[in-house]
Design a protein with these regions (language model features):
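Zn2+-dependent metallopeptidase catalytic core
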Residues: 57, 295-319
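Conserved catalytic/binding loops enriched for acidic/polar residues
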Residues: 432-664
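Sec-exported extracytoplasmic/periplasmic mature domains
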Residues: 305-316, 420-421, 425, 461, ...
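Bacterial Sec-dependent N-terminal signal peptides
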Residues: 1-20
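The catalytic-center signature of Zn2+-dependent metalloproteases
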Residues: 324-347, 409-465
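Extended catalytic-interface subdomain
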Residues: 355, 360, 366-374, 412-423, ...
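Auxiliary tRNA-acceptor-end handling modules of aminoacyl-tRNA synthetases
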Residues: 19-292, 310, 314, 325-382, ...
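Soluble non-cytosolic domains of exported or imported proteins
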Residues: 55, 82, 253, 290, ...
Length: 664
């Protein structure tokens, strides 16, 4: 009993002694870095301490987690720069401890409304971490967060559930996990750490049965005053965040969506009000990844700055700027993982894709930062489809050694598309049906208007233009819908009433014009992917006519003496895919329902069936181009160049799938 009492007394005395020690004495052998969260780091011991000022407590902080490095062949869509988690956190002082909570801004109510109390009670923020307070002095509270950032703590999402199952990933190995580096700035703190896991079925080429990940956490202060939000109009496409207002008079919680937008305000508001072009206080800046090959950088920059024109429609000049990555001398703190920098990432990956995700303030929809991601092998996708879809009418496409300026032009437009996502715009699959089919055979029309009304559709190439058509634009470009959508999202207003009226009038006067319509798919045959033109039957007829020419010349255009037929086989398989897309554009007419997004008072029918006559024409087209054996796809001289015993099944399965879709 006496020993127990003695031990307790010693422990209490030690605790009391520790509390008497100053923060300086407790951190004297640590590397200090002052910022929004003052950090004390001792890498040789794996120790990280945070000193939080009272001014930070219970303030919303945005925490974004990204991969810095990850294992080879881990996932097609998880790469360096990919976001694994994003959320708002806050630190709360409670009984000598600091709690780390995750906040939500989905369910809301006016502060003065009694129901606000119920909203709070029924939306308790989860606790992600609890830290014993080491000391407090002069408004600072010192805590040890070493374990939190050395383990797989809640909210990191380092390992995806699918990958965890597929690779049989076990629990974190703490002996092989550690904090790498820490950096703090006035508005953000960056913490990088390595996490290691055993994996009984690791990805191919990994025989160690071990997976290590390096992640970066950006903790950034959100604006003291949230940006004024803009409620979405369903007739204009915008990425958005859903919120529920329990102070609504609608006899239920009023759910609505707020648009995801960058905060753009004019430097000279009086000049802006006069209709003059004005620079924003803070432009949108995208840096190129240091890993971007030099020869592609000019095209990436052009793709980013293609959006300058649409922003001018909204009254802003130089609203978006592309920059090379700064040197260490220019900006020693630059890091693509730092949430202060928006970067177009160039990823060494076999994935054929590109993406444009962004980080948002959930209170207002303000876009804080975005990282556009370009996957290296996406180059091959565009080269192949350029040949297959335009080669019949476009001499420059009839080779696998596509001219650099042609590849660069395609990359430019892909970057512009992904930057559009980063600005808040989703895909608009309706826009590719805005133009009359035969206008896409006109050089003057396509050079001025492009091949679709927006860069945000999956309308990549002009497959309608025929051999002999002159001065044709074959690659997509910015369109009138892009001007329209950006003006809706970014035009600045001082008055809420003026904003509401102007936006409604603006959409009311534009939204029934096909070039300004928005649609996202479903059963609407005019909102399909990879199509162009207002008549799927006619467009497909032109496309198939061209594809037959390409098939006849495929070997000549893809192989040279002394080479294998691997490229020929790859292009043949992709040619079948192009054929399938053209056919399915017609299939969509059968049982299709045209959609026009309207509001009460507009003279249009929101939903109407495709006419019987048009559906019969579609069946006749399928009878000619699908049900009858397409011998041009099965030429023995072509097929015999490579072993493909399943080529007959490819066509048969396509026929079956189309029939199943029609009947169901």
């Amino acid at each position: 009993m006496r020993n127990t009492f003695t031990l307790a007394l010693i422990a209490f005395s030690f605790f009391a002694y520790a509390q008497k020690k100053t923060i300086d004495s407790l951190t004297m052998d640590y590397t200090a870095d002052k910022g929004i969260l003052t950090t004390y780091f001792k890498p040789e011991k794996g120790k990280l301490l945070l000193a939080l000022n009272d001014s930070v407590l219970e303030k919303p902080l945005l925490m974004v987690t990204r991969y810095v490095k990850l294992p080879a062949n881990y996932s097609a869509y998880r790469n360096a720069g990919s976001k694994t988690a994003e959320g708002v956190i806050s630190f709360e002082l409670k009984e000598g401890k600091l709690l780390l909570r995750q906040l939500s801004y989905v369910n809301l109510a006016e502060d003065a409304d009694p129901i606000a109390q119920s909203v709070v009670q029924n939306n308790l923020p989860p606790i992600l971490g609890v830290f014993e307070k080491m000391n407090s002095e002069e408004g600072f509270h010192l805590v040890d967060v070493s374990d939190f950032f050395s383990k797989d703590s809640p909210g990191f999402n380092a390992v995806g559930e699918t990958e965890k199952k597929n690779y049989k990933i076990g629990s974190l190995d703490s002996k092989r996990s550690f904090i790498d580096r820490v950096k703090s700035f006035p508005r953000n703190t960056e913490i990088t750490h390595t996490l290691t896991y055993p994996a009984a079925a690791a990805p191919r080429s990994n025989r160690s049965e071990t997976l290590s990940f390096q992640l970066n956490h950006s903790i950034i202060a959100l604006p003291e005053k949230p940006m004024k939000s803009r409620t979405v109009d369903h007739r204009v496409g915008w990425f958005s965040l859903e919120q529920y207002n329990y102070s609504s008079e609608a006899l239920k919680s009023d759910n609505y969506r707020i648009a995801s937008r960058w905060k753009l305000e004019p430097k000279d508001k009086e000049a802006y009000a006069r209709g003059e072009l004005v620079e924003p206080i803070q432009p949108i800046v995208f840096y190129l990844d240091p890993a971007t090959p030099m020869k592609w950088r000019p095209y990436f920059k052009k793709g980013i700055e293609d959006w300058k024109g649409p922003f001018e429609k909204a009254g802003f000049k130089n609203a978006i700027v592309a920059k090379d990555p700064p040197t260490k001398e220019e900006d020693p703190d630059f890091s693509p993982e730092d949430v202060r920098y928006s970067v177009v990432r160039y990823v060494a990956s076999t994935t054929r894709n590109a993406t444009g995700p962004s980080v948002k303030d959930p209170r207002s929809g303000e876009i804080i930062e975005s990282d556009v991601i370009w996957y290296h092998n996406h180059l091959r996708s565009y080269r192949n489809r350029y040949l297959l879809e335009t080669g019949a009418a476009n001499e420059k496409a009839r080779t696998l050694n596509t001219p650099e300026e042609e590849i660069g032009e395609m990359m430019r437009r892909v970057i512009a598309h992904e930057v559009g996502h980063a600005l808040g715009l989703p895909h608009n699959m309706k826009a590719s049906s805005a133009y009359p089919v035969d206008s896409l055979r006109s050089g003057s029309f396509t050079q001025k208007m492009g091949i679709a009304a927006t860069i945000m559709d999956y309308a990549r190439y002009n497959y309608i233009a025929q051999p002999g058509d002159e001065n044709i634009r074959f690659v997509r470009q910015m369109g009138p819908y892009d001007d329209y959508a950006i003006e809706w999202g970014y035009r600045y207003f001082e008055s809420d009433a003026a904003e509401k009226k102007w936006l409604k009038d603006f959409v009311d006067t534009h939204s029934l014009n096909p070039i300004y319509q928005f649609g996202s798919g479903g059963n609407d045959p005019n909102a399909q992917t990879e199509n162009i033109g207002d008549d799927p039957i006619k467009a497909t007829a032109y496309g198939l006519s061209n594809l037959k020419i390409v098939a006849e010349n495929l070997e000549e255009w893809t192989t040279q003496d002394g080479q294998t037929f691997d490229d020929l086989q790859e292009l043949y398989m992709e040619l079948i895919g192009v054929y399938r897309r053209y056919i399915y554009h017609v299939v969509a007419l059968i049982g299709g329902v045209n959609e026009t997004r309207i509001v009460k008072g507009q003279e249009a029918i929101p939903y109407y069936n495709v006419s019987v006559q048009k559906q019969r024409e579609a069946l006749a087209s399928l009878d000619q181009n699908l049900w009858k054996t397409q011998k041009w796809l099965l030429e023995p001289e072509l097929i015999s160049r490579f072993e493909n015993e399943g080529h007959l099944d490819l066509i048969a399965n396509l026929q079956k799938a189309a029939l199943y879709r029609i009947l169901n």
